[in-house]
Amino acid sequence: SQEFYENMLRGHIKNKDVLLYKDGAQIGRKSMFREGFPHEICCINEHVFILRTNELCTQNYLYFWLDQPEITQKIRNLNANAAQPGINQAGVKGLPILLPLKSLIDDFENISEPLLAELFNLAKKNNLLRKTSDLLLPKLISGDIDVEKLDIKSINGVTV
């Protein structure tokens, strides 16, 4: 609930946060939150790290660095508890990150940022379409919404 979220002292997700799952079956899985996707407001629990960069690197670079198979394997190898798979904060802070020249990171950002912005924008639109479909389809099937008199001849050049 909104009240629960507001009472949380830690773990609030910010735009472009990179999340790293630290235990369980999904250890090493990465996510990025942007522009309210997948949720407008969100917070994490104790099973996830929020990773935020400093001025040496960008969130986009960090996400793609972590998403490499070799780095994912290094993360999984940090597993400090065989009974319950998991990684700790010290292990994550000790992960190597190759930082190219700042100019190259800036170039990467200039290329990746508009692509990621569009990707997340389309993902939000897909969610909205899915929700709209979930609301409308049962009403259409049951006849609650009558489409007999709709004047739809074509949609985007496709004859209906």
Task: Please state what every model-predicted region is.
Residues 15, 29, 94-96:
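Extracellular/lumenal ectodomain signal focusing on beta-strand-rich modules
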Residues 56-57, 61-65, 72-74, 78-81, ...:
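Amphipathic alpha-helical coiled-coil/heptad-repeat segments
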